[in-house]
Every structure is written in C-alpha cells, then in structure tokens.
Amino acid sequence: MSQDQPIVLDPTYASFDAAARPADLGATHFIGIGGAGMSVLAEMLHAEGVSVDGSDRSHSAKTDRLETLGITVEFGQRAENVAQAETVVYSSAIKPDNPEIVAAHAAGKRIVHRSDILALLMNGKRAVTVAGAHGKTTTSSMLSHILVNAGADPSYAIGGFIQGPDGTTLDGGHAGKGDILVAEADESDGSFAKYHPTIAIITNCEADHLDHYGDEAHYRAAFVAHAGRATGHVIISIDDPDGLAVLEAMPADVKSHTVAYGTTARESLPDLGGAAYVWIASESETAGSGVEQLTLHLPAAVTAGEPVSQSVALKVPGVHNARNAAAAISAAVLLGVSPADAAKAAGTFLGAARRFQVRGTVKQVTVVDDYAHHPTEIAALLDAARRRYPDSTIRVIFQPHLFSRTKFFAHQFAESLAKADDVIITGIFPAREKQADFPDISPSTIVDAAAGLKDASAGTWIQPVEDMCLAAKMMAMRAHHGDVIFTVGAGDITDMDQVLLTALEAHRESCE
C-alpha cells in the first residue's frame, strides 16, 4: 500500500495466498480486539505462537479473557499502539481515519482485514465455513461440539461464546491439534469471497446486508460464488425460497457435490439438479418438554454407504434449530463421524451463548436472552418460545441493530414482534452507522409499522422506550407470575439482563 495514496480499506481484497502461514505475520496488532470475531482470531494466533496485542475502546469479558492469556490490550486507540507491529488487523467496523490505521499506513505496515487472518488459519486444514443470514453461530457451535465429542480436537472460530453446563460459557475460539477448522463465514461485507473451504455450509440466503450488496440479486450471487469455491461439499438449506434459488443458480459441477436439506419431503420438491437431499422429519417438541424430536434421513451421498434414518433429540428448541442440526450433523458425518455418534453429541448441545439463553428467574418470571436481530430470526425465536412456554405470557424488550436494517425491515419487524404479547422497543444500536445519516429512523419506526398492521398485532402491546434501563423497569412492572421476558438484539441489550432481574426483584409484588 503506497503511503502517498488515500487510505482505502477493502475487506474483499485477499492479502495472502494458500502457502501463507501464521508465522509469516510477525508481531500482529488487532484494532478493536474485543470484538466478537476479532478476539477469537487473536486468541487463535496467540495459540499458534504469534506475538499478538491489540486495542479497544473499553473493557469487556472478551478483553478480560485475552489479558488472562497474556495478550496485551490497550484501551483507547492511538498511533503509538501500532509502533511495534508488523501486521495490523482491522474489521469492517474500523474506518480509514482511525488513528491506528493512519499510523500503520504512514509507516508502511501490512494492513489486513480480519477475514485475511481467518483465511490464513484455514490454510492446510480441512476447513468448514458456515455462512448465511441466520444460524451461523449455532450451527458452527453445534458442529464444533460434535467434533470435540468425537475426539477430533478441531480448531474453531465462532463469533460468540458457547453455552456450557450449569450456566457456564465456553469461549468461541480454540486452536486444536486436529486437522479440522470450523468457522463462521461473515457474508455481511463480502469478505467470505476469500475462503476456499472443504465444506461450505449455507444456512439461509434470506436478504440482509443490502447496505453492502445493493439488492437481493447481488446478495444471492455472492452465495452462489461462495458455493463454487468449496473444494469438497456444499451443504445448503432450501426451506427458504432464496436458498432454493441459490441452489438452482449453481453450476452443474457444483450441484453434483451439494447436499441440500429441509423440512419438505423429497417427493414434494422440484428437481434439484443432481444435489443430494437430507429430509428433516420433525416430530416437534412436546409442549414444555424442552426436547425437540426429529429424524434426519441422510442419503448415501452423506453417509458414503447406505442411506440412514437417524433419530435426534435436541435440547435447543425450534424448527430453526432442527435445520441447524441437520447441517451440523451432515457436515460431521462427511468428516468421518458416524450418524449415531453425531446425533448423540448434538443431543447434549446446550446452544450458543445469547441463543435462547436463560439468564435467571425471579419469583417465577424467567428472563431469556437472544441475539435475534432480523425479522425471520425473531419470528423463529418467538415460535420456539411458544412451544417451550405454551402457557406463559411472552414479553420482549427488543433493541434494533443498525438504522439501515430498521429502515429496510420495519414492517417485517412489526409482523414478527406481533407474535409476542408485550413488546418494548429500545433505542437503536448503531454499530458502524450514524444516526445523522438516518434522521427519520427511530424505535417509533417499528411501532408505527405495527400500528398499520390489520390483524397481526391486534393483541400485542408495543411501545418505544429509548432508554434500556427504563425499558427494563417498565417491563418488570408489567410482569406477572409465570411470564417469560426475552431481551432480544445483537447490540448491548445483553448487558441489561441483570438490570432486569434486579428490577423484577424490586417489583416482585407484580410477579405474585
């Protein structure tokens, strides 16, 4: 990168070839090291023996963990933080005017996107990528859990924690001694174009990230291209029309090593052009049982032998998790795990952190946290909630993520949230965006859309409350014995759970 040229950060530019290895990086500095994806990669490089440090704006559970591993984290982003680095890593949240980017550019240092680091870690491994609008973290976590239980000791790079027993959490990054690497492939900025996985899982192709892709056609085309880069198999959900459209657009040679999956019986599907098919025969959760029963009909293309009908009992609720299990189990079997062992391990999986995660109960009011931030994810969450808690009032505190997503999907959010009984919508989490660029978008945008629904939201109380603490207190005052309150969103609403539990205790007379 010439020091005389303007700084352009292009996440789709590939910085390394297939021969590159972590040792080639030299001392490596991460800007925003506490981010979900960045912290995992920093930890994995550290485990590979690379000298790693980083900076972030504030302390978090992620930065605390990195420091316990011996990784230096500076708080505040300043030019001097990159002085000793040979390689500087940024994410799509980092702008060209960041002082550490400016200093690294002026010094002629190597500046790479976080996806370059993940691509580098894949070199020499049997890599499994998980891309898609929904289900990436759960599917990659479940697959990693299955492989760990099978004794494979995989490496994995997952943008979140994994739920462990007794309310504990396991870190989403691990540098294993085996030859398998499981990773989320973030499609939001197009950077997954750098990956050439052995197995490419595509969980869902519903439109999202239109701020980057412009329209649905370009978004779907990116998944078609991603499938074409897989060196082994493609595993893709075709329960949604967009997934089926992506499959149909694949070249014949890609379809020939593709495994589609879904809940529709094979005889009711159109011609799949040579792709194999895993049918998910869901027996559904017995209301309130906490177990999702299903049978996976695995074809010979997956088992490398005779077709197998494998029963699975999941502890994670909802049809969407049955789909996630189909993808994870299919990939595990393709990697050499027996169907029975894969199903048994999947049945002990408790979920990724912030996915239907129970945070506590006060006076028989249960608080559950979930990362859902797209209308389809919210609809799936609330459907699962009705199955898990059939006799409860379902209340939701929702923090929208991104002004652009709120603008694009306001009506769809309103329709999904109408599945709840009570809804409070808090201030929008901006992430990389600025309110000034979206002056007319606010929590009321979704509330106004809900008011325009004819029947769907007739029984749902929905209000905008900008301040999350106030929202928690208001919802606590509305709660009653047996209710379930969900905190929902991809932003910092997860930090409100303790506030909500405290508010419920303070207003415990409402819960009795």
Curated annotation (Swiss-Prot):
Taxonomic superkingdom: Bacteria
Enzyme class: ligase
EC number: 6.3.2.8
Alphabetized GO MF terms: ATP binding; UDP-N-acetylmuramate-L-alanine ligase activity
Keyword Plastid applies: no
Pathways involved: Cell wall biogenesis; peptidoglycan biosynthesis
Catalytic activity: UDP-N-acetyl-alpha-D-muramate + L-alanine + ATP = UDP-N-acetyl-alpha-D-muramoyl-L-alanine + ADP + phosphate + H(+)
Record's keyword annotation contains Aminoacyl-tRNA synthetase: no
Keyword set, alphabetical order: ATP-binding, Cell cycle, Cell division, Cell shape, Cell wall biogenesis/degradation, Cytoplasm, Ligase, Nucleotide-binding, Peptidoglycan synthesis
GO terms for biological process, alphabetical: cell division; cell wall organization; peptidoglycan biosynthetic process; regulation of cell shape
Sites where the protein binds ATP: G132, A133, H134, G135, K136, T137, T138
Cellular localization per UniProt: Cytoplasm
Pfam families: Mur_ligase, Mur_ligase_C, Mur_ligase_M
UniProt xrefs under InterPro entries: Mur-like_cat_sf (IPR036565), Mur_ligase_C (IPR004101), Mur_ligase_C_dom_sf (IPR036615), Mur_ligase_cen (IPR013221), Mur_ligase_N (IPR000713), MurCDEF_pg_biosynth (IPR050061), UDP-N-AcMur_Ala_ligase_MurC (IPR005758)
A GO CC term attached to the entry: cytoplasm
Record's function text: Cell wall formation.
UniProt record similarity statement: Belongs to the MurCDEF family.
The protein, known as: UDP-N-acetylmuramate--L-alanine ligase
UniProt organism field: Bifidobacterium longum subsp. infantis (strain ATCC 15697 / DSM 20088 / JCM 1222 / NCTC 11817 / S12)
Organism phylogeny: Bacteria, Bacillati, Actinomycetota, Actinomycetes, Bifidobacteriales
